[in-house]
C-alpha cells in the first residue's frame, strides 16, 4: 500500500464528510474516515457483548422457582444470545472491512471492481458490493431458494 493512502498516518479534519470530498476516490482521508467509523463500531459492539456476559449470562434469573418467570427469563436469555451471535458475525465483517482498508481494496465492489457509492458506505461501512451488484446477488439467492 502506498504512503499516500495510508489511513493511519492521516489526520481526519473536524466535521469531515467524504461525500463532500472532491479528491480521488478512497484517498487517505476517506480511508481514515471509514477506518475510524469501523473501529468505533467494533468497540461499541465489544462493550455491549462484555455487558451481556457480565449481566445476562451470570444472572440468577434462570434459577427462579416460578415456571412463568423462568420461561420468560429463558426467552430473554435466548434472544440476548441470538443478538450477540449476530453481533459476533458483524464484528467479523467489520474486521474484514478493516483488512480491506489496509489492503487498499476498501470501497470497491468485490464483484465488479466498481467504486461503491460513498452514501452506501456511510450507511453500511461493511458493504462489499455496489447497490446494483447486491440487488443482483439477492435476486439470484431468492431464485435459488425458490427452486
PLM features per residue range, with description:
Residues 134-140:
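Extended, non-catalytic scaffold segments that flank or surround catalytic motifs
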Residues 33, 111, 125:
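Amphipathic alpha-helical recognition patches that constitute DNA-binding helices
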Residues 88, 106, 127:
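Residues immediately within or flanking Cys/His clusters that coordinate Zn2+
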Residues 2-103, 140-141, 146-147:
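Interaction interfaces in information-processing and related assembly proteins
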Residues 127-134:
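Cysteine-rich micro-motifs
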Residues 119-123:
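Short Cys/His-rich "knuckle" micro-motifs
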Residues 109-112, 130:
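Short cysteine-rich clusters marking metal-coordination/redox-active sites
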Residues 115-117, 138:
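Short functional micro-motifs and their immediate structural scaffolds
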Amino acid at each position: 500500500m502506498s504512503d499516500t493512502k495510508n489511513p493511519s498516518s492521516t489526520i481526519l479534519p473536524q466535521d469531515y464528510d467524504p461525500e463532500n470530498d472532491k479528491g480521488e476516490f478512497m484517498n487517505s482521508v476517506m480511508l481514515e474516515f471509514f477506518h475510524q467509523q469501523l473501529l468505533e463500531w467494533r468497540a461499541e459492539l465489544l462493550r455491549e457483548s462484555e455487558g451481556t456476559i457480565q449481566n445476562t449470562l451470570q444472572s440468577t434469573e434462570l434459577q427462579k422457582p416460578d415456571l412463568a418467570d423462568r420461561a420468560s427469563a429463558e426467552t430473554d436469555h435466548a434472544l440476548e444470545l441470538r443478538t450477540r451471535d449476530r453481533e459476533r458475525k458483524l464484528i467479523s465483517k467489520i474486521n474484514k472491512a478493516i483488512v480491506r482498508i489496509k489492503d487498499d481494496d476498501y470501497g470497491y465492489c468485490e464483484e465488479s471492481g466498481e467504486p461503491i457509492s460513498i452514501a452506501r458506505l456511510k450507511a453500511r461501512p461493511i458493504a462489499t458490493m455496489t447497490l446494483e451488484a447486491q440487488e443482483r446477488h439477492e435476486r439470484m439467492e431468492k431464485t435459488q431458494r425458490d427452486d
